[in-house]
Amino acid sequence: KSNNLAQYELQVEELVDKELEVFKAMYLQETKIKYLIIIGDYISEISRKVEKNKEDNTIETAKFLKYIRKLDEKTLEEISEELNLSNESDALVIPYMMIFKCMAESIGAESLWAPGTNVSDGIAFHYAQKNNMIRVEHDFEADVLSAARNLSERYMSYTPHIDALTQMATLIFDTMKKVHGLGRRERLLLQVAAILHDCGKYISFANGPSCSYDIIMASEIIGLTHKEREIIANTVLYNTWPLPDYEDLADKLDHDSYLTVAKLSAILRVSNAMDRSHKQKFKNVKAAVKGRELVITIETMDDIALEKALFDAKTAYFENVFSIKPVIKEKRVYG
């Protein structure tokens, strides 16, 4: 192996190691990883060489690293021959190997799994699912909500309030289905917005809404597009701030997305006001649209003067968006 190639490999390792250290500090901390899933070019070829008789594509990390170090002593042409690659001078082989090696060493997983898929498979699957060409049993919405909850926990959001708010927002959304005309996907976006609405307070109490917006836009939430993250981030922002005219947001949102933000933020505002004290005072909450009113029936043993006052203050925006006035119908419960 030439000195230039050895120096190149060292530079790649240093660069990748630095990024992995930041990733571990932010996302893993003391978490023990059992399996590291690797997709992409060359990993399937390496997997077949390391574990020749296995059918589940799993590799013991120690065996994997031993084989990578063996390849590391070879030239590019020798590596290509070892892995039976069609292109003997593929310049990406070495960087891929270095990335695989750094990840396996840094993450410290017990085993690696190479499912044999790549990004192209994901694009094809997404197209087929979107156009109802295949039936999917896996609940991808649960993955989105799980990723959102992990992000919420990282920024120390108060879980009991998050759960209560998510349930309330979902109840109002479902009750208003014929009024707002939104679908299942927008329901998911509302739930994610409810989960993440307070994450910015970890950075600043005074500028919580704008910090929440920045956190959401800077975070890759599995299963969401950039446009959907923009809708969620603006829903969270205008849960607190007044919603500007469309012309002021036209550089961020198209007209349909703007209307979605208006509807979701109106629902989130009213839902948030129902648990403003963060004490989950309401039990057996029910909602129904009656004429021009959204009647929310609650049972409580507590004083809800604060919630009622803030609720009344939030209803004007909701009524402006939907032409329906939310009202609380209280049932006293004595224990």
PLM regions: where:
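Helical "lid/coupling" subdomains associated with nucleotide-phosphate turnover
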Residues: K1-R269, D275, K290-R292, I296
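Short, glycine-/Ser/Thr-/acidic-enriched flexible segments
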Residues: I43, V119-S120, M301-D303, V333
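A short amphipathic beta-strand at an alpha->beta junction
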Residues: E110, F322-G335
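Amphipathic alpha-helical domain-onset/packing element
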Residues: V270-S271, K314
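Low-complexity, glycine/alanine/valine/leucine- and proline-rich hydrophobic stretches
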Residues: S277-P326
